[in-house]
Amino acid sequence: MHHPRVRTAVAGLVAVLSLVPLAACGQSDSTAPPSSAKPATSASASLPRPKPYTGDFKKLEREFDARLGVYAIDTGTGREVTHNDRARFAYHSTFKALQAAVVLSTYSLDGLDKRVTYTREDLVAHSPVTEKHVDTGMTLKELCDASVRYSDNTAANLLFDPRAAGPKGLDASLEKLGDDITRMDREEPELSRWVPGEKRDTSTPRALAEDLRAFVLGKALRAPERAQLTTWLRTNTTGDAVIRAGVPENWVVGDKTGTGSYYGARNDIAVVWPPDSAPIVIAILSHRGTKDAEPDDELIAEAASVVVDSLSS
């Protein structure tokens, strides 16, 4: 694994160059028209040059036979790293962080003691926490904890408010936040059965990062609810091998992972706190080339390392 602390100074220089605005004028060569000629008007003349880190992401895509989407922003400087950041990907279980935020907004911390009962018939695959509490039920706070920190699928389904049309209600809440990109259509585990070309249960790296930033760093939640969401994300148990593995060890990471049933899909969205520096918001989404491909955490970790190199130089 190539961690940021062992990358070469050349990589850092390339990252710096990627953040310098392009000059307005073009370069000339021996075949260029004389100065009296009209400026070029072809489409190619107006195309932006590839960012230096784009080559790193494309190399990862080739190495892992994967499609990769990345959006990251240093909230202190506004500097961004982008790669397919406006393209659609299945979000998989990353939505659980946003869902918990909406629950916090709806009920506040004081309302999370409400107990939800359910039966064994309500259990779905990968429910390591809820399967132990069928007899007693769980509070909204316990369900959010199970959903965000353990990616418990039944907990997420129980948090979909039936009075607000389930997933569509969450979709509407995100639209009120300003996100008209993310589509919430199905519950677990069906939402993880995405196939290429499908728009259901998809978003973009940019949209997910902007949502996460609004909830964790912005004013979408009151301070007590924002602190609780941050605690859940920072104590997530499923993210050690993804974004956390691609940033320096002394950086604090709060994240929510996602894994698809098909095409080796693996995602992670995170807020990262470098020491003595403003937070960085990162969303990395991916899927691989064949339906039976396995997810590979290394792809996400390596992509996170590219992000850190590009923003830290």
From Swiss-Prot:
What terms describe the molecular function in GO for this protein? beta-lactamase activity
Where is substrate annotated to bind?
S151, K256, T257, G258
Active site (UniProt):
S93 (acyl-ester intermediate), E188 (proton acceptor)
Which family is annotated? Belongs to the class-A beta-lactamase family.
Q: Which PANTHER family match?
A: BETA-LACTAMASE, BETA-LACTAMASE-TYPE TRANSPEPTIDASE FOLD CONTAINING PROTEIN
Source organism (scientific name): Streptomyces badius
Example of a GO biological process term: response to antibiotic
The record's SUPFAM superfamilies line, in alphabetical order, gives: beta-lactamase/transpeptidase-like
- What enzyme category does the UniProt record give? hydrolase
User: What span is annotated as the signal peptide, if there is one?
Assistant: 1-26
Disulfide pattern: none
Listed EC numbers: 3.5.2.6
Biased amino acid composition, Low complexity? 28-46
Report whether Nuclease shows up as a keyword of the record: no
Kindly provide the name given to this protein in its UniProt entry.
Answer: Beta-lactamase
| InterPro entries, sorted | Beta-lactam/transpept-like, Beta-lactam_cat, Beta-lactam_class-A, Beta-lactam_class-A_AS
